[in-house]
A protein has these predicted regions:
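Loop-helix junctions at membrane interfaces
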Residues: 3-262
Length: 262
């Protein structure tokens, strides 16, 4: 009689324990996957910071700026960059709606042209942190990582090349080089890591993302054609527009913002 009464409870308890174990295993798996993503982000940030620091060691002597003034300039440029980043907009005839175009690299470049490569990485990082605090993320943080890393692939080469000679001609070459680096690196990074990770973290099938691209360009049928026909043109357009604005505004903005005459 007792066995008849307690047997269902035993089976129920065992089933509940098995389900809880399964849920905990799934939770730890998700934590491990997200931890890997976080560690990847940190590794990229540290790598870019070290690259910028190394580049500065081989550049000609830069302007002497007090620490307080350096902090204030980076802070002002990062704040402006954050506002421009929040004002991003989709370009539906080029790429799916989760790809946005913004001009936040403009103040980052102005900051880098004045202070050097390290300032660009710091400015980019502060921009992303402020954006996350003010607006959060709509892309499971993948878009924020992309904006930081791909943005650095644009502003770092441009800033490093500009500081070699500090002339308008050098600025043009640097901005052109930065646009090329951003287009090539951004396209490859999207294909190899960002898009698959976005699909994984956001719970969206990869085929669905490719299908969004096919709706815009009929020639898209896999991830390679997706990044070539959607991501690359978007990066080229952004690089070209920000480059033109930087050339037009740097000297004009440098006078009131940085207090320089040349």
């Amino acid at each position: 009689m007792l066995a008849f009464i307690f047997t269902p409870w035993v089976y129920s308890g065992a089933y509940f324990f098995a389900q809880e174990t399964k849920n905990m295993n799934a939770l730890w798996t998700q934590i491990a996957e997200n931890l890997t993503f976080v560690l990847t982000c940190l590794a990229l940030v540290v790598g870019l910071a070290l690259l910028a620091k190394l580049a500065e060691k081989f550049l000609p002597e830069r302007r002497t700026v007090t620490p307080a003034r350096r902090v204030s300039i980076i802070g002002i440029c990062a704040a402006i960059a954050t506002v421009l980043h929040i004002m991003d907009f989709a370009v539906p005839f080029l790429a799916p709606g989760f790809y946005k175009l913004d001009f936040s690299e403009l103040p980052v470049l102005l900051c880098g042209f004045y202070l050097g490569p390290c300032a660009t990485v710091v400015c980019e990082g502060i921009k992303i942190l402020l954006k996350l605090l003010l607006k959060g993320t709509s892309t499971a943080f993948v878009g924020d990582l992309a904006n930081f890393v791909v943005g650095c692939s644009f502003v770092l080469p441009a800033t490093i090349w500009y500081h070699v000679h500090k002339s308008k001609h050098s600025a043009i070459i640097g901005l052109t080089l930065g646009t090329i680096c951003m287009s090539v690196f951004g396209t490859a990074f999207n294909a190899v890591y960002l898009i698959p990770k976005f699909a994984e973290l956001y719970g969206m099938p990869l085929d669905a993302i490719i299908g969004m691209g096919t709706a815009i360009h009929a020639g898209i049928h896999n991830i390679t054609t997706f990044v070539v026909m959607c991501v690359a043109p978007l990066n080229v357009v952004k690089g070209a527009m920000v480059s033109v604005l930087t050339l037009l505004l740097y000297k004009r903005v440098a006078r009131p913002l940085f207090g320089i005459r040349s």
